[in-house]
Curated annotation (Swiss-Prot):
It comes from Shewanella baltica (strain OS185). InterPro entries: HATPase_C_sf (IPR036890), Heat_shock_protein_90_CS (IPR019805), HSP90_C (IPR037196), Hsp90_fam (IPR001404), Hsp90_N (IPR020575), Ribosomal_Su5_D2-typ_SF (IPR020568). Residues 346-562 are annotated as: B. Residues 563-637 are annotated as: C. This is Chaperone protein HtpG. The gene is htpG. It holds the Pfam family HATPase_c_3. The lineage of its organism: Bacteria, Pseudomonadati, Pseudomonadota, Gammaproteobacteria, Alteromonadales. Keywords: ATP-binding, Chaperone, Cytoplasm, Nucleotide-binding, Stress response. Residues 1-345 are annotated as: A.
C-alpha cells in the first residue's frame, strides 16, 4: 500500500539547491565524484556494522558501486549495495543539512559566483550536487536488515519539496537516478562517464563498476569466427586502499583526489604526509594540511578528527582522540593494526595505544609544518594566514610540544614595519642586541594601536625590536608562553622594562636623578588622583609622550580584562600604575601650576588620555569630554 508523503526542504537546503540549479560550478562533473564517494562510504559503513551482525550482508558480501547511463532517456544511475537508508533516514539526510552554523554560512554568501563557489566547496554539498546537472532526482533505497517491502522511493525536482513513498526493493543499498537537463546530456555518454570515473575513483577502496556491452559473433581477418561475448560489469578502479599502497606508486594527482574524497573539499591540499609506523604500535597515517580553512573552523559544535580504520575496515569518522584541538584543521586517516575492530569512542578515550598514536601523529604534523616553514616560507605564510590563530592555542593545550609550537608562530614586528605576521621567535632572537635577555612584545586591539603605542618610544630609540600582537587570542597565548629558548617574553606595558645591560650607567644615573627631582610632583599627582590609580611613577619608557598607564607585575593586563568581559566573566577591579614623563613640556608646566584645583584637572586629563591610548575606550567618555572642554575654555580666555 502506497504511503506517499510530500515534505518541504529545510530553508538552507532550498538556498543550496537554488545555487546548484543555477549552475554555480564551471566544473560540473564533480557531482559524480560526490555521489560515488557517498556510495563508497555506504559500503564502508555496512562492512563495519556486519562485523557484529553478519546477517546484514544478506548473502551478498561483495560490496561495490555500479554506474550506468541511458543515453535515450538521458539518465545516469549510481547504485551501491551498502548500508542503505530507512524512511526516516531518507527524510533526515535528503531533506535537511545536519550541520551546526548552517544559517550563518548562507549569510556569508555574496552573490558573486567565484567567491560563493569557493565557499560552497568548503561547506560540502554531497548528495545535493546531483542538481548541478539533473532536473529531477529519483532515489530508491532499502536499509540493510530491513524487509524488501520496507524500501523507500524519494523524488524531487529540486524546487521547494520532495516526495517519499514506500516501495518494494529486492536488494539492499541505494540507487540514485539523475534525469539530466537537456544541456547536460553529455554525461549520459558512455565515454564521458568512463573518463570521469577513471579520474575520480582510483583511490576508492571498493570496486566501481560500469556496464560493458557484449559483442555479437563476427568474422576475423583470416575468416575465423570470433565468438560473441556477453555484457558484463567491469571494474574501473584499482579498488585497493590507497594508503596501503607504496608511496612510490602514488602520484600527486592521486593523493589530491583522495584528499577531496575524504574531506569533500573542492580545492587541492597544501601538503600531505604518508607514513607507515612499525614498532610497539603498527599503523599507517595519511595526513593532509588543507589550503583553506573550513567555513566553520571556530564553531564549537564542529566535528573534527581523523577517519579511523582498523585493519583496512572503516570504523568511524571524526576520531578526535588522535589529534589535539589546536591541530583540528588536519584532515586524513589512520589505519591501526593494534586496536580491536569493535573499538568505540569511549574505548579510544582512555587507551594507551590511542595515546601513543596521538603523540606520534602530533609530532608528525608539527614536523610537516617545521619542514614547510624551513623550505618554503611563502607557502608557510599561506598556511599561517588560514590557520595561524588556531595554532596559537597550542602552547596552552600541549605542554610537551610547547617549544616546537612556539617556533612555528609568526608575529608582526617593529623590525619589518609591516602588519604582516612574518617574524618567528627565532628570527627575533637572531637580531637581539648584545646584552639583551628578553623578548619584548606588546598586545593591543589593532596593529596600528600596537605599532603607535607610546610604550615603544624608548625601545624604538634604542633600536630594540618589539613583537606587535593584535589578535584576540594573543593575550591568551602569551599567558601560556612565558619563555622561548630560555629567553623570557616580556610585555612593554607591564611593570618595569627591565632593560638590564641595554641601559648604560649614564642613563641609569640620569633616570635616578630625574626621579629624585620629581618626588614632589609625583606626590602632588598621587594626592590629586587619589584612589583612581595604584601608584604614580616617573617613566623610564617614554620619550615623546607626557604619560602612560601600565599594569603591575602579576596583575591582569588590559587585553585579558577585555577578553574576560567579552566572555561574560567577572573581572576584579584593577587600578593602573600612572607613569609620567617630567621631560615633556605638558608635565613640566603642570609642575609649575599653583592652583591645586587646576592641577587636579590637568592630572586627570593626562590620566584619561593615557587610558584612552592604552584601552581604546574610557569608562565615562562623557566626563572626559566635559573636562577637556572645560580646560579648553579656561585656556581660551
Amino acid at each position: 500500500m502506497s504511503q506517499q508523503e510530500t515534505h518541504g526542504f529545510q530553508t538552507e537546503v532550498k538556498q543550496l539547491l537554488h545555487l546548484m540549479i543555477h549552475s554555480l560550478y564551471s566544473n560540473k562533473e564533480i557531482f559524480l565524484r560526490e555521489l560515488v564517494s557517498n556510495a563508497a562510504d555506504a559500503a564502508d559503513k555496512l562492512r563495519y556494522l556486519a562485523l557484529t551482525n553478519d546477517a546484514l550482508y544478506e548473502g551478498d558480501g561483495e560490496l561495490r558501486v555500479r554506474i550506468s547511463a541511458d543515453k535515450e532517456k538521458g539518465t545516469v544511475t549510481i547504485e551501491d549495495n551498502g548500508v542503505g537508508m530507512t524512511r526516516d533516514g531518507v527524510i533526515e539526510h535528503l531533506g535537511t543539512i545536519a550541520k551546526s552554523g548552517t544559517a550563518d554560512f548562507f549569510k556569508n554568501l555574496s552573490g558573486e559566483s567565484s567567491k560563493d563557489s569557493q565557499l560552497i566547496g568548503q561547506f560540502g554539498v554531497g548528495f545535493y550536487s546531483a542538481f548541478i546537472v539533473a532536473k529531477k532526482v529519483t532515489v530508491r533505497t532499502r536499509a540493510a536488515g530491513h524487509k524488501a517491502d520496507e524500501a523507500v522511493l524519494w523524488e524531487s525536482e529540486g524546487e521547494g519539496n520532495f516526495t517519499v513513498d514506500t516501495i518494494t526493493k529486492a536488494s539492499r543499498g541505494t540507487e540514485i537516478t539523475l534525469h539530466l537537463r537537456d544541456e547536460e546530456k553529455e554525461f549520459a555518454d558512455d565515454w564521458r562517464l568512463r573518463s570521469i570515473i577513471t579520474k575520480y575513483s582510483d583511490h576508492i577502496s571498493v570496486p566501481v563498476e560500469m556496464w560493458q556491452e557484449g559483442t555479437p559473433e563476427s568474422d576475423g581477418a583470416d575468416g575465423e569466427k570470433i565468438p560473441a561475448t556477453e555484457g558484463q560489469w567491469k571494474v574501473m578502479n584499482k579498488a585497493t586502499a590507497l594508503w596501503m599502497r607504496s608511496k612510490a606508486d602514488i602520484s600527486d594527482e592521486e593523493y589530491q583526489e583522495f584528499y577531496k574524497h575524504i574531506s569533500h573539499d573542492y580545492t587541492d591540499a597544501l601538503l600531505w604526509s604518508h607514513n607507515r609506523v612499525e614498532g610497539k604500535q603498527e599503523y599507517t597515517n595519511l595526513l593532509y594540511i588543507p589550503a583553506k580553512a573550513p567555513w566553520d573552523m571556530w564553531n564549537r559544535d564542529r566535528k573534527h578528527g581523523l577517519k579511523l580504520f582498523v585493519q583496512r575496515v572503516f570504523i568511524m569518522d571524526d576520531a578526535e582522540q588522535f589529534m589535539p584541538s589546536y591541530l583540528r584543521f588536519v584532515q586524513g586517516l589512520i589505519d591501526s593494526n593494534d586496536l580491536p575492530l569493535n573499538v568505540s569512542r569511549e574505548i579510544l578515550q582512555d587507551n594507551h595505544v590511542t595515546k601513543a598514536m596521538r603523540t606520534g601523529i602530533t609530532k608528525r604534523v608539527l614536523g610537516m609544518l617545521e619542514k614547510l616553514a624551513k623550505d618554503d616560507a611563502e607557502k608557510y605564510q599561506q598556511f599561517w594566514a588560514e590557520f595561524g590563530q588556531v595554532l596559537k592555542e597550542g602552547p596552552a593545550e600541549d605542554f610537551a610540544n610547547r617549544e616546537r609550537i612556539a617556533g612555528l608562530l609568526r608575529f608582526a614586528s617593529t623590525h619589518t614595519g609591516s602588519a604582516a605576521p612574518t617574524v618567528s621567535l627565532d628570527d627575533y632572537i637572531s637580531r637581539m642586541k648584545e646584552g639583551q635577555t628578553k623578548i619584548y612584545y606588546i598586545v593591543a586591539d589593532s596593529h596600528e594601536a600596537a605599532a603607535n603605542s607610546p610604550h615603544l618610544e624608548l625601545l624604538r630609540k634604542k633600536g630594540i625590536e618589539v613583537l606587535l600582537m593584535s589578535e584576540r587570542i594573543d593575550e591568551w597565548l602569551i599567558n601560556h608562553l612565558t619563555e622561548y629558548k630560555e629567553k623570557q617574553l616580556h610585555s612593554v606595558t607591564r611593570g618595569d622594562l627591565e632593560l638590564g645591560e641595554l641601559e648604560d650607567a649614564s642613563e641609569k644615573e640620569a633616570q635616578e636623578k630625574l626621579e629624585q627631582e620629581s618626588v614632589a610632583l609625583v606626590e602632588r599627582i598621587k594626592a590629586a588622583l587619589g584612589s583612581t590609580v595604584a601608584d604614580v611613577k616617573v617613566t623610564s619608557r617614554l620619550t615623546d609622550t607626557p604619560a602612560c598607564v601600565v599594569a603591575g607585575e602579576g596583575e591582569m593586563s588590559t587585553q585579558m580584562i577585555k577578553l574576560m568581559q567579552a566572555a561574560g566573566q567577572p573581572v576584579p577591579e584593577v587600578k593602573p600604575t600612572f607613569e609620567i614623563n617630567p621631560a615633556h613640556p605638558l608635565v613640566s608646566r603642570l609642575n609649575d601650576l599653583q592652583d591645586e584645583a587646576a592641577f587636579a584637572d590637568w592630572s586627570n586629563l593626562l590620566l584619561q588620555q593615557a587610558q584612552l591610548s592604552e584601552k581604546g575606550s574610557l569608562a565615562d567618555p562623557s566626563a572626559f569630554i566635559k573636562l577637556m572642554n572645560q580646560m579648553l575654555l579656561a585656556n581660551m580666555k
